[in-house]
């Protein structure tokens, strides 16, 4: 039985240690499942550009995160969407992305991109539920069969 979550959200940035700890946990999980092949994305996953980060806290403890970075004047990329295992299947990631999308639309961006593992079915289903659809690969992901790129237009 799942306990009650007393959730609050906090808007922050990529330097927040609570966010960085969740990202380290996310990365450990990826490395356990995928192995060293994942290292080809290390440079891409560095925080060398500012990110807008939304944290979910339960009784003050970080339980989930989602972020985005600006790609250009029209678009953003959602990244580092993660929910701790004990809190999954409760709609938390959905809520975090929706909240970030509100910020993106307020700032007049036209669309967003999300990249995920080609076999990450739960993530793909979540993004489809949020209105994302498959799109052409971009940047370093062109020709990379291990990932898929998804896009959502904001009208």
What role is predicted for each listed range?
Residues 97, 104-116:
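Conserved GNAT acetyl-CoA-binding A-motif
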């Amino acid at each position: 039985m799942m306990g009650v979550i007393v959730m609050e959200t906090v808007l922050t940035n990529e330097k927040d240690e609570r966010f960085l700890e969740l990202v380290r946990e996310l990365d450990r999980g990826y490395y356990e499942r995928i192995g060293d092949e994942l290292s080809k994305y290390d440079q891409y996953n560095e925080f060398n550009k500012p990110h807008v980060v939304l944290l979910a806290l339960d009784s003050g403890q970080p339980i989930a995160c989602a972020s985005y970075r600006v790609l250009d004047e029209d678009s953003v990329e959602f990244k580092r969407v993660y929910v701790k295992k004990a809190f999954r299947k409760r709609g938390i990631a959905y809520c975090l992305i929706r909240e970030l999308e509100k910020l993106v639309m307020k700032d007049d961006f036209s669309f967003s991109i999300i990249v995920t593992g080609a076999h990450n079915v739960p993530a793909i289903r979540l993004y489809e539920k949020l209105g994302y659809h498959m799109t052409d690969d971009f940047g370093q992901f062109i020709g990379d069969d291990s990932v898929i790129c998804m896009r959502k237009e904001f009208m």
